[in-house]
Amino acid sequence: MNGFSTEEDSRDGPPAQAAPFFGQTCCLIDGGERCPRPAGNASFSKRVQKSISQKKLKLDIDKSVRHLYICDFHKNYIQSVRNKRKRKTSDDGGDSPEHETDVPEVDLFQLQVNTLRRYKRYYKLQTRPGLNKAQLAETVSRHFRNIPVNEKETLAYFIYMVKSNRSRLDQKSESSKQLEA
């Protein structure tokens, strides 16, 4: 019903909506060989093709096929590659295996849209107008992960501020109170 095929659907035959596509196989060529899996409801759009070429995957469309439908395996594979975080070292035993623990995962989607916009404005990030919250959070998190940080200096400053019970926000509010008086 939702456009995704299930195991039940494949056992019982094609669902009513996918009846015209029955018997079609995936339109992709994977590593030089045509994919033999049955085509699902997902199509190989220009956007998907662009993301595949950017990731340098060994997938191409078979020109002899008259449809653009891909199998569920390739749909999930493309989605997983598209959603994977870029890492500085590769997963196949890169330079330092403990590097993955050094990069904390920060969920910037929890922030308000106005906060994300302020971040974008402060760092002058280039985006197209009219981004929704998810797109804005993705852009900001991509930038956030690439900011170089002097960890020792930052931690020392943080500890100093905690011990002295002060923060920049406290200083600003005190100076504004003095101006009002």
From Swiss-Prot:
GO terms for biological process: negative regulation of transcription by RNA polymerase II. It is found in: Nucleus, Nucleolus. It comes from the Eukaryota. GO terms for cellular component: histone deacetylase complex; nucleolus. The keyword Transit peptide does not apply. Residues 82-103 are annotated as: Disordered. A motif (Nuclear localization signal (NLS)) lies at residues 83-88. Residues 85-87 are annotated as: Important for DNA and phosphoinositide binding. One of its GO terms (molecular function) is non-sequence-specific DNA binding, bending. It holds the Pfam family zf-SAP30. Keywords: DNA-binding, Lipid-binding, Metal-binding, Nucleus, Repressor, Transcription, Transcription regulation, Zinc, Zinc-finger. The keyword Repressor applies. Interacts with components of the histone deacetylase complex sin3a, hdac1 and hdac2. Binds histones and nucleosomes. Belongs to the SAP30 family. This is Histone deacetylase complex subunit SAP30L. It comes from Xenopus tropicalis (Western clawed frog). The gene is sap30l.
